Amino acid sequence: EIWRSLVGSEMCIRDRVVDDTEKLVERVQNAQKNKEIVSIAYHGNIVDVWESFYENNITVDIGSDQTSLHNPWSGGYYPVGYSFEEANKLIYENPKKFKSEVILSLKRHVEIVNKHVKRGTYFFDYGNAFLLEASKAEADILKKDGSFKYPSYVQDIMGPMCFDYGFGPFRWVCSSCKQEDLDITDTIACEVLEKLALSAPEDTKQQMMDNIQWIKAAKENELVVGSKARILYADSNGRIEIAKAFNKAIKEGKIGPIILGRDHHDVSGTDSPYRETSNIYDGSQFTADMAIQNVIGDSFRGATWVSIHNGGGVGWGEVINGGFGMLIDGSEKSEINIESMLFWDVNNGIARRNWARNKGAINQISRAMQKNPKLKVTLPNLVDDKLIENI
C-alpha cells in the first residue's frame, strides 16, 4: 500500500522510484554520468541491489544497513528471493523454513557486502543487530580475534564526533500546538547557538555550525509531522542555555509552556554494546548502569516524568534505554530544574566515556569541571599498555 501510494503521489518523481534492478542500475549510471544530486527509492530486497551494483561495476562509496534484525523471525528481515507477500505467507505457514531462509539470506547479504568492501566501500552497521544476527547465522562477518569486521556507526562516527563531546538529540514540544510558537523557539535556539559558537573550542566548533545550519533550515524543509516539535543536536551547555531562553520567553508571554526531552539514542540515555556504548572499550560496554543512573538522577533533579525501557532499536535483552520529559512554565523553579537536570543528563554520559579513555570525552568533562567547580569527576590515568603486558 505504501509503495502504491508513493508511486501515485505528487511527491514522487517516477524515475526516482523503481522496483526493477535493471532500471535502477540504468538510473544510477545516468545520474553518475550527469553528476546529479538525487535520491532514488528502490522497492525490493537490498541484497539484489548490492549484487546488481557489483555485477555492473557501480562503486558504492558508503554503505550501511538499518534492517530491523532485532526482530529477525517476525518480519524484521525479509529473505532475498521472496516477495513481501510470499515471505509473510511463509512466516505464518512454515516459520521454521522462514528462519532457515533468513539465515541463508544473511550469509548471502554479508558475502556481497564483503565483495564491495574489497573494492573500497566503507561499510558500517547502524546497530539494529545486523552484525549480531549475521554472526549467529555464521556468515563471514568476524575477524580472527572474534570481533566484527565492521564498526557500528557510533564507533566510527557518532561516538567520537558527537556523544563524547555531549552532543545529542535534544527535543522540545510546544504545548500550545501553535506554529508561531515553534517558529519563535527556532529563532531562540539559533540565536543561542550563534552566541555560544563565538567561544566554542576548536574541537566542537564544527558541530555548532552544523547545528546552526540545521535549525535555520528546519522550517523550510517541513519536518513537523504532528505535534509542533523540534529536534536539535546540542551539547550540555547548548541544551541548558536554549531551555533557559525558552523559559524566559514563556515568562514574558511570548510562547506557551514547553516540554523538553531527547531521544534515548543519546550521550547518556542508553547502554548497548552494539550501538550507543559500542565506542566504549574498557569492557564496561556490556553493563547497563549508565541508563539506570541517568533515569534516577533525572527524577531527583526536576524531570516531570522518567522512563526506563528495554530493547529500543537494538533488540530485547541487548539494550537498556532511559528517557525523560520536563515541562517548563516560565517559573523560577523551571530554571532551577533546567540547570540541574540537563547538566546531569548529559555529563553523566560524558563522565562514563571519559573513564573509557575517549579523548574527546576527557577534554569535554575537564571543561565541564572548570565551568562548574561543584562537578568532581575522576580522570583516567593514561598509561602504556606495555607496562602491564611486561609484568
Can you say where each PLM-predicted feature lies in the sequence?
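Short, surface-exposed connector motifs at secondary-structure boundaries
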Residues: 32-36, 227-229
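Short acidic-hydrophobic, aromatic-tinged amphipathic segments that line or gate anion-handling sites
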Residues: 14-25, 41-43
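Short, flexible, glycine/charge-rich loop motifs used to bind or transfer phosphoryl groups or to couple energy/partner
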Residues: 1-2, 53, 296
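Ligand/cofactor-recognition surfaces for anionic moieties
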Residues: 42-46, 62-322, 326-391
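Extended catalytic-interface subdomain
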Residues: 40-58
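Short amphipathic alpha-helix with an adjacent loop that forms part of the alpha/beta core around
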Residues: 26-30, 52-55
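Extended charged low-complexity segments that act as oligomerization/scaffolding linkers
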Residues: 21, 28-34
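Single conserved hydrophobic/aromatic residue that forms the stacking wall/gate
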Residues: 1-8, 12-13
